Amino acid sequence: MSDVVSVGFVPMSTSAKGLLVVFCDETLASGPDSRKALGTAVDAVKRAAETSRFKGKSGAALDILAPEGLKASRLVVIGIGKPADLKEHDFLKLGGTIASKLGSGKEAVTVIAELPAGPMSPAQAAALAAGVRLRAYKFDRYKTKKKDDDAPLDASVAIAVRDVAATKKAFAPQNGLVDGVNIARELVNEPPNVLYPAEFARRASQLSKLGVGIEVLDVPAMTKLKMGALLGVAQGSARPARTVIMRWNGGKKGAAPIAFVGKGVCFDTGGISIKPSASMEDMKGDMGGAACVVGLMHALAARKAKVNVIGAIGLVENMPDGNAQRPGDIVTSMSGQTIEIINTDAEGRLVLADVLWYVAKKHKPKFMVDLATLTGAIMVALGTEYAGLFSNNDELATRLNEVGLATGERVWRMPLGPEYDKQIDSQFADMKNTGSRNGGSITAAQFLQRFVDDTPWAHLDIAGTAMASPKSDINQSWGSGYGVRLLDRLVATHYESK
């Protein structure tokens, strides 16, 4: 992964080197250790704040070169706004602000993890460190020539805390979680000639090093299972399909697992119903759901989560050739239900149909959550700030909404109902794979619901959040890694053994 920042924790008494970072509120007040570290430079800070009209607003930063009275070569004062308003996600964002101030080349950074009232808690300092790593991620593997102002970053960030041991303990699961997010980002950012189904499966299989059980289904295995919906999508590509089943057994032996299913269309041309050429290159990211599931499984295994989990991803390419699926074809899914193909560019739901059915019937999970860059319609409805949430279970939907608000990876519940079924009724088969333009994200979810049977289930349409979403305080990457933090928190809060 393109991780260019190392983060560690040191005692508050550590002398600052290179760049010194402190925090202040809207009154420009800092904590006692911060004031001690600043020494006589406090006056220089006040003058600079007045000159630049720095007010200590949340996320605002005052950058001072060679501050008088300090051995540090740079001083950055970051505003926190009103301390009483700070929530967990705000510390991630503050960490992102730190990362945004890092220069190119080697740089030593000391951060005083302190609020005006005193030291940050271990959890707050851990979130700060995670925010630094999330923002600092960069994907530039294929650039052979870099501009002078785009030199490689090699920063060492030392976060000064009151209790080093407790903060390290709090950061350990956060560190694995950031690794999981960055794995998901890396997968989404890779070009499609590099990351095709077999290569994706190979990378997912590397989770075995963390104790994750791996099963890879090739085309003969899926043919034997009668996964006709998934294989129909894949038949136009020279790159054979794969389905990868990942299992983490961290809970009680024999306890039913929870399950996460990801759409993994490694490149989507639309097939015979071919897409316009403009922005087709973005369809390398049509496997954002599968990338999230792999990143999530890494995060859970890295912290040895006390829960049994299944992660399943269907990996295909949707390509046009003489053997490609045609509009008008009828395929038989693993469930035995038949599907008339109206539009070959409505392929993700076909992939998910077979993988959802496989997981529901073979592993009998307590619930399933699927993630998919499924419809452009969800972007019309929600833009790029929220993922669409569809569910047949109110408790699961409520929990997803709550952890979305806590992590900043927000969801918005959309309707399901039998009234929408008529849009996907077929004259020739049990159903067709797309309806009218109206309510397109809803009818896609309504289609998926036919393949979960009675299993509690939620569908996250992440077309607007997984890739090319707006850059934020903690993400500057085209592939955002959306969903890893959301689902990790869902598991930790509601489903792990305490």
UniProtKB/Swiss-Prot annotation:
Subcellular location: Cytoplasm
Gene3D superfamilies for the chain: Leucine Aminopeptidase, subunit E, domain 1, Zn peptidases
Names of the cofactor(s): Mn(2+)
Catalytic activity annotation: Release of an N-terminal amino acid, Xaa-|-Yaa-, in which Xaa is preferably Leu, but may be other amino acids including Pro although not Arg or Lys, and Yaa may be Pro. Amino acid amides and methyl esters are also readily hydrolyzed, but rates on arylamides are exceedingly low; Release of an N-terminal amino acid, preferentially leucine, but not glutamic or aspartic acids
Binding residue positions for Mn(2+) 2: 263, 268, 286, 347
Pfam families, sorted: Peptidase_M17, Peptidase_M17_N
Assigned protein family: Belongs to the peptidase M17 family.
Name this polypeptide is given: Probable cytosol aminopeptidase
